[in-house]
Curated annotation (Swiss-Prot):
Segments on the Cytoplasmic face: 1-75, 210-714
Annotated organism of origin: Ralstonia pickettii (strain 12J)
UniProt: Zn(2+) binding residues: 502, 506, 579
Name of this protein: ATP-dependent zinc metalloprotease FtsH
Biological process terms in GO annotation: protein catabolic process; proteolysis
Region of interest called Disordered, as start-end residue ranges on this chain: 688-714
Chief location bin: membrane
């Protein structure tokens, strides 16, 4: 009968970094489940292959780091050396003898001659020993004797520096003092002279090794994408948080629908756009809308700035583009969002002067990746820019960023919706009217409205109010539009009178021009850097077209302040510089761009940028598309428009001289005249009166010589 063979136990292999699994886990690994479902955060957006095994797979943290059967090796640390040195110094301090009195060599000789020395140890540089404290009252200083007797009674230790004294030994022998030779104790200085340089060298060496190792690691990671990944609902933004841009939300809802149900479009043979370009002015909500799309679709969201691609090393930008798209393929369906695309996708230079080889190579790699990208993989590329005119045409062609979503500044209804979103966490007073506030903020983008609400809340908190009132919103609007109010400056009374008539001239002309915007406030309180006063006009509705008659009325309002100064004082000031500049620009646009000149006809005469410098970032030299004689005709037409406006304004102010004087007097008294006060003033019967004498003690800002700036409700 054959003996059963005895099985030898096999040597247990050392398996580092493996999972400790039971039989069920082993079966799961055979089936291909190598990833713990609970660690899916490392691979966001990818569901586990077998959800039923989610609770059965476990990692042994010790096994992942190191085999527990192996002894851990102790690593040498610089702290060991430092602790040892400190311990040695502590031992020396603790076990040293009692207090040692340091005395001059002359006192040592006095004690020797008086026979008070007990024993002496003579070293190379110092002499130490003990002496008797009895009968030394007249030998040492009184303060020193008191200190010695406080320390100890009887014999006391001393120390003194050795002086070249050849008769010292003879004197010690004559005094019958026991003395010995003693070498100096240099062990501490010797240790420090060896250990300290070694410690410094070791520290520098360790620091350099770590820096080199870190640099090597960073060099390996330099080509990796720097995109921030937000998983599913981590963006924290949905379409409910976006208001005032309903058209853009409707346009992007198709993207959300594709990411949620791609088969719906693929079944009919449709393909979702590969790239979506969000175009709009700063603050219109481009980045917010992209996050809302990712939050609605519930997919990973890769966020990266256009400037993050380019580094100081050549080729890094292209490598990061490749790595970004490679990561996106593994996380599909997902969204890649590139903010400030113009930093990366600027038009490639036509010549070698303005070329940027590294940026252009990065752009080329982006074009290649987008061109070879399969739109059915579920990866949507979104980008945002506020300068679409400088983007490379190859980037905007169909097949890349083939869908452009324009985000315009919100209209009246949109501004009201945006305000409702931003005031959700703000305690509002009952009289706050968001519709009225939206009407007073034409041209405000979403970021501007958010800033307005925040400023109003801060002003209310500064005044210790329990809720934000409408007055806080009015003050916040004035701060944003006109700048910080400066009441503490003392202004020359004559200059204050000039500013009052200047602003009154604007207001009177605006009230007598039916097509001009309505005056909402007139103030002679300085604001900001250069505004010594302002006349605020608020349009009653959003306007997208302006007629020639409306532009002429606006010209009249701009010249109202200058003509009022000339009419009242017979002289003009520098305060109208900004008015004249804006009036000249408006008149030139009417002639060169809008075709509103009878002499020049319907042709446009804009200065065109030189295409040689397009997209190079260099200063673009404008070239005229018309002759010198045409330029002279344009200048003549501009002067003609301004002269005609000046005559109309002068006629209006001369006919309303009484109201002009009265409104200026009212401004000198109240400093700020709102719409309610202005209506009462215009409806009241005004008696003619001479120009008012300004009050000298009214606090205002000093004359700066800078032009005043009127807010025209922009």
């Amino acid at each position: 009968m054959e003996k059963p063979r005895r099985l030898r136990p096999r040597a247990r292999p050392q398996c580092r970094g493996l999972m400790k699994v039971n039989l069920g886990d082993f079966q799961a690994s055979i089936l291909g489940t190598h990833t713990n479902a609970r660690l899916s955060g490392a691979y966001p957006g990818r569901p586990p292959t077998f959800p039923a095994l989610e609770t059965r797979l476990t990692f042994n943290k010790v096994d992942l780091e190191k085999n527990p059967m192996e002894p851990r090796q102790q690593q040498f640390s610089l702290w060991y050396v430092l602790v040892t040195i400190l311990a040695m110094l502590a031992i020396q301090t603790l076990f040293v003898s009692g207090h040692v009195e340091t005395i001059p060599y002359s006192d040592f000789k006095v004690l020797l001659k008086a026979g008070k020395l007990k024993d002496v140890a003579i070293g190379e540089q110092a002499i130490s020993g003990t002496f008797s404290t009895e009968g030394i009252d007249n030998l040492l200083a009184k303060q020193q004797i008191e200190e010695i007797r406080r320390e100890a009674k009887g014999d006391h230790a001393f120390s003194t520096l050795r002086v070249a004294d050849p008769e010292l030994v003879q004197e010690l022998e004559a005094a019958k003092v026991r003395f010995v030779g003693q070498p100096d104790n240099k062990w501490l200085s010797t240790i420090l002279s060896w250990v300290v340089p070694a410690v410094i060298f070791f520290g520098i060496w360790s620091f350099l090794i770590k820096r080199v190792g870190g640099a090597a690691g960073s060099m390996m990671e330099i080509g990796k994408s720097k995109a921030k990944v937000y998983m599913q609902k981590e963006t924290g933004v949905t379409f409910a948080d976006v208001a005032g841009i309903d058209e853009a939300k409707e346009e992007l809802s198709e993207i959300v629908s594709f990411l949620k149900d791609p088969q719906r479009y693929q079944r009919l043979g449709g393909k979702i756009p590969k790239g979506v370009l969000l175009v709009g002015a700063p603050g219109t909500g481009k980045t917010l809308l992209a996050k809302a799309v990712a939050g609605e679709a519930g997919v990973p969201f890769f966020s990266m700035s256009g400037s993050d691609f380019v580094e100081m090393f050549v080729g890094v930008g292209a490598a990061r583009v490749r790595d970004l798209f490679k990561q996106a393929e593994t996380k599909a369906p997902c969204i890649i969002f590139i903010d400030e695309l113009d930093a990366l996708g600027k038009t490639r230079a036509l010549n070698a002067v303005g070329g940027n080889e590294e940026r252009e190579q990065t752009l080329n790699q982006l074009l290649v990746e987008m061109d070879g990208f399969d739109s059915n993989k579920g990866v949507i590329i979104m980008a945002a820019t506020n300068r679409p005119e400088i983007l490379d045409p190859a980037l905007l062609r169909p097949g890349r960023f083939d869908r452009h979503v324009a985000l315009d500044r919100p209209d009246l209804k949109g501004r009201e919706q945006i305000l409702k979103v931003h005031v959700k966490g703000v305690v509002l007073a009952p009289e706050v009217d968001l519709t009225k506030l939206a009407g007073r903020t034409p041209g405000f983008a979403g970021a501007d409205l958010a800033n307005l609400v925040n400023e109003a809340a801060l002003l209310a908190a500064r005044k210790s109010k329990q809720m934000v009132e409408m007055a806080d919103f009015d003050e916040a609007l004035d701060r944003i539009v006109g700048g910080l109010e400066k009441k503490n400056r003392v202004m020359n009374p004559k200059e204050k009178e000039t500013i009052a008539f200047h602003e009154a001239g604007h207001a009177i002309v605006a009230e007598h021009r039916p097509l001009a915007d309505r005056v909402s406030k007139v103030s002679i309180i300085p604001r900001g850097v250069a505004a010594l006063g302002y006349t605020q006009q608020t349009p009653t509705e959003d306007r997208y077209l302006l007629k020639r008659s409306e532009l002429l009325d606006r010209l009249d309002v701009l010249l109202g302040g200058r003509i009022a100064e000339q009419l009242i004082f017979g002289d003009v000031s520098t305060g109208a510089q900004n008015d004249l500049q804006r009036a000249t620009d408006m008149a030139r646009q009417m002639i060169t761009q809008f075709g509103m000149s009878d002499q020049l006809g319907l042709a446009t005469y804009e200065n065109m940028p030189n295409p040689l410098f397009a997209g190079t970032g260099l200063m673009q030299r404008e070239r005229n598309e018309y002759s010198e004689s045409t330029a002279q005709m344009i200048d003549a037409e501009v002067r003609k428009l301004l002269a005609e406006a000046s005559h109309r304004v002068q006629a209006t102010l001369e006919g309303q001289r009484t109201k002009l004087d009265a409104l200026a007097q009212l401004l000198l008294e109240k400093e700020v005249v709102d719409r309610q006060d202005l209506d009462m003033f215009l409806s009241a019967k005004v008696t003619p009166m001479p120009p008012p004498k300004p009050v000298a003690n009214i606090e205002e800002s000093t004359a700066t010589g800078k032009p005043d700036q009127k807010t025209q409700g922009t």
